[in-house]
Regions:
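RNA pseudouridine synthases
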Residues: 1-266
């Protein structure tokens, strides 16, 4: 039958059994069958070390740093203490200062992160995020099929989200108990990506809230753009990477009060 309206499934895609719902009651039936353990974006230690060695630092002073996180690297250490932005900067600043993560990006997402070096700066930056004075822009690549939907070139998506308790880390649209999630978008135009120069549509995404997987769900859900981001293994189809990138970040430096603005291309 059809998937529940809270689920995001794309017609024609194969979705393996999941650990959350299926394995506890059907383990004996799943022997020899692919089980989705929701760790599809996991990167081995060797790859993570290589990613950490080419971490790009755009700005650094005694109070904060702005870095470009590559796709495949964690923002903070996982359960197996994998390499992360946090651990790399802790090592870099060892004996000088600590690293305080102000915000995070999914492992599969690339782009800009600001990291504080003192607890006071950390609190001040977090307050800016709470007051929504921090400006963020993401760039994503969508399949050409989005052009067939004849959507407005600019728009606003409001779909409340909550975690799926039986299928983590997936999020679901929950109009009863979900937290407000608001995204503005602007279609930019056609582009190419990857070694094969495949065609896609570039879109700018402006999150006005910061829910887990917000941009991914708002793109994929039928009541959003109904078009998953290319490479989104949770809500669409796998590819060489998730083509979602935090391209612009703007905030006020808590110490100098200077307005800081950073850009990095996808």
């Amino acid at each position: 039958g059809p998937s529940p309206k809270t689920e995001i499934r794309q017609h024609g895609n194969y979705y393996p059994a999941c650990n959350g719902k299926c394995k506890p009651i059907l383990e004996w039936m799943l022997e020899g069958i692919d089980v989705d353990d929701k760790d599809c974006n996991r990167t081995d230690n060797k790859t993570q070390l290589a990613l950490s060695e080419r971490l790009q630092i755009l700005y650094e002073d005694d109070y904060l740093a702005v870095v470009v996180k590559p796709s495949g690297l964690l923002s903070v250490p996982g359960k197996d203490n994998q390499a992360s932005i946090y651990s790399i900067l802790c090592e870099r600043w060892k004996g000088k200062s600590d690293a305080f993560m102000v915000h995070r990006l999914d492992m599969a997402t690339s782009g800009l992160l600001v990291v504080a070096r003192t607890s006071e700066v950390h609190k001040a930056l977090q307050a800016q995020f709470i007051r929504r004075t921090v400006k963020k822009k993401y760039v994503a690549l969508l399949p050409l099929s989005i052009l067939d939907k004849q959507l407005p070139t600019e728009g606003r998506i409001e779909l409340p989200l909550s975690p799926d308790p039986d299928d983590r880390p997936r999020q679901r649209v929950d109009r009863t108990n979900g937290k407000p999630a608001i995204t503005e978008y602007r279609l930019i135009g056609k582009t190419t990506y990857g070694e094969k120069a495949l065609e896609a549509v570039k879109i700018a995404l402006y999150p006005l809230t910061g829910r887990t997987h917000q941009l991914r769900v708002h793109c994929a859900h039928p009541d959003g753009l109904s078009t998953p981001i290319i490479g989104d293994n949770l809500y669409g189809q796998r590819a060489e990477r998730l083509w979602l990138h935090a391209a612009h970040l703007e905030f006020t430096h808590p110490i100098t009060q200077e307005r800081m603005s950073f850009d990095t291309p996808l």
